[in-house]
Amino acid sequence: MLRVFIFFVFLGSGLAGKVKSPITCKYFISKNNTWYKYNVTILNDTIILPAYNTIPTNATGISCTCHDIDYLQKNNISIRYNTSILKTFQDIRIIRCGMKNISEIAAGFSKELKFLDLRYNDLQFIEYNILRKLIRSNTPTYLYYNNLMCGKRNCPLYYFLLKQEQTYLKLLPQFFLRRISFSNNHTYLYHFLSCGNKPGHEFLEYQTKFCRTKFPEINITVNQLIAKKNTERYKNCYPFVLVSIICSCISSLFLLICLLRTICKKYSCTKQGKTTHSYIPLIPSYTFSLKKHRHPETAVVEDHASTANSPIVYIPTTEEKKVSCSRRK
């Protein structure tokens, strides 16, 4: 008996561990303008909502949120909607978890959604044709994507963007574009899902066309959008650019100083050579001594090393001058 008791205890604890936490949903009553909560259970690892007996017939909208997203992802629990009941609502507010393809939510819908929340999904891209079926083109629509609310009540523009572009949604929350990349020529195509009541204006990057709506404050060109992106992209490089400019200025100043120094040095050396070195001796200096000779003009020159630096000077005496003059006579 003890073994049987222990067996049932372990069995009960194991079953209790598999009990799934409920998912909280709400339905909206437009008469009271109030949301009412109700719980939905998990059946065969699938959440089926809403149930026919849990939502009153006068409800005009539903909203279902993930109670524990981590729990759903770890246990591979998916959400399946009863699309037949969803068709009757005018304001459908849906939050999906773990969705990787928007076609999962688009299947079975016969009317356009007025509210769509895609924050808790791993969507790499959203197909344009499917999204156009889910949102209304002539009435304001809220669209949540990557934790950013994209939509305004006073702006009938709708968009979806690639997941990596979520940063730029903060810059232009009222301007909704789709960006498609072409791998061939690295060109980007911006597609306006709705411009006022006109569907689909397409522009290539760097073109100056723009989509003007009936709201004057929403008027922006594709070039302005690209300029905002480039500003955000290169904002972190500004300090490095400043440092490089300062270094180039310092190097230019150093080269200019060296050039001026070389020119000044050359100019000062030339001037000094003209003033102090006007006489450059080509032969060594000698001291002359006159020996007695019959012709003083042909006197022999003797070198005296002791007075080698004396100048070349020869001054005849008075007697020699007289002798020379008398001989000439």
Swiss-Prot record:
Post-translational modification remark: Highly glycosylated.
Residues carrying a glycan: N32, N39, N44, N58, N76, N82, N101, N185, N219
Extracellular-side positions: 32-239
Membrane topology label: Single-pass type I membrane protein
GO CC aspect terms: host cell endoplasmic reticulum membrane; host cell Golgi membrane; membrane
TM helices/strands, residue ranges: 240-260
Keyword Signal on entry: yes
Keyword Protein biosynthesis among record annotations: no
Location(s), subcellular: Host endoplasmic reticulum membrane; Host Golgi apparatus membrane
Triggers of expression: Expressed in the late phase of the viral replicative cycle.
Domain of life: Viruses
Intervals, Cytoplasmic compartment: 261-329
Similarity comment: family membership: Belongs to the asfivirus I329L family.
Domain notes: Contains putative leucine-rich repeats (LRR) and a C-terminus cysteine-rich capping motif similar to domain structure of host TLR3.
Role, per record: Viral TLR3 homolog that probably prevents TLR3 dimerization and subsequent induction of IFN. Inhibits dsRNA-stimulated activation of NF-kB and IRF3.
UniProt name for this protein: Transmembrane protein I329L
Organism of derivation: African swine fever virus (isolate Pig/Kenya/KEN-50/1950)
